Amino acid sequence: MSHRIRTRTLTVLAVLLLAAPFTPATAQAAEAAHVEGSLPSGAAYLMDMPARWNGTVLLYSHGYTPVGAPNPARNSPDDATRQLLLDQGYALIGSSYATNGWAVTDAVPDQLATLDAFTSRFGPARRTLAWGTSYGGLVTTAIAERHASRIAGSLSMCGLVQGGVANWNSTLDPVFALKALLAPDSGIRLTGLGSPAVAAEQAAAMAGAVTEAQKTAAGRARIALAAALHNIPGWNDPSRPRPAPTDWDSRQAAQYQALVGLVRLPAFAWRQEAETRAGGNMSWNTGVDYTSMLGRSPYLKEVTELYGKAGLSLKTDLASLGRAPRISADPNAVDWMSRTSTFTGRLTEPQLNIHTTGDALIPVQAESAYARAASAGGSTSLLRQRYVDNAGHCTFSTGEQIAALHTLEDRVDTGRWSRSAPVDLNARATEAAPASAARYLAYRPASYPRPYDRSSAWDGPRG
């Protein structure tokens, strides 16, 4: 491993810090250190050790980084949260992962190797907590389920905790509906994309069809139907005012913007990269009843109203959707995605999940999918899920994130989920960062459209 060290002051204690491992008690008297290095895999890592270490190290897993994008190591969600945690005495570590994209097979070992590197340099922590955001929530949960001996607890924030198979199935459903209802004769390929160039071509064609459809009442109704199949909320951008509950037009406009984003990146470009790793198409909709799925969506009322306003028959469109040729998966690709990226729900240490209610990228119903897995896996008592009343993906305040960490720590210390109600989390958030928002609320998400886990009855492809 290679290392590059920067310390705040060049003192004898800093020299000792570089020269030998030490215990948490020794670390409390040392100078703060910032360590950057690389792992044998090629991943970069980042470590921040505070001057007065409290003995806890936080292993942070970052979100999805597309192929071709910069991929620096990260050890916290944002700078403000990082600084407050360092001020409170936490050591912060994290890696870049060796590759970009759907990199779970690199991410998990790279994160554990980063923890090993930390221990070699600074000595064993009194306690290790794993935490992560977005795709990093998937990585964190994978560590929690498969490497529980390495951590005392875990925190998933806006996490992709429905797992990989369910994620890609639910990414397929809205674009399948868009093609069937807006461009049935277009020849747009939804899976088996082959190359980045093919994916980009299909994404552009679909985005064009959606953009054109948004100009008519009929098109807007059909876009709302596609959004409902993915449970895209009608308020998903925190920079915009929250629409009134029955402001269907404003809600649909927000869903349209989110769907365009889904088409431009996850549904085609990111899918193609994941298919390459999986060795084929890992998604299917054989046997899927979209009428039933829409009936379970919290956005059914909006779809019904917009269809009525457009003078369209929802029943007729659902029949057309039911007749559209279905897509079958490659069993080997499903097996790869299931083995690497799907959960059992079997926890042995406590995990806290937090999620915003207005998340369009990983809709809040992902939490229902993991609750289902935890129930089947027999670990419901170890899981708590709490919700923040805000639009957007991972749009937590600094206080809300630190409140979640402190709540998890209490569970690790006491064996009980004490002070974990929304009102308690809000109090913790205000205490941690008085100027930041505290928006936890009592909330129960709807069911996930198509869950898939490794502990429930067979969820696999049919047909």
Question: Language-model features: where?
Answer:
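C-terminal His-loop and adjacent cap/lid subdomain of alpha/beta-hydrolase
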Residues: 30-463
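Secretory targeting and sorting signals
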Residues: 1-29
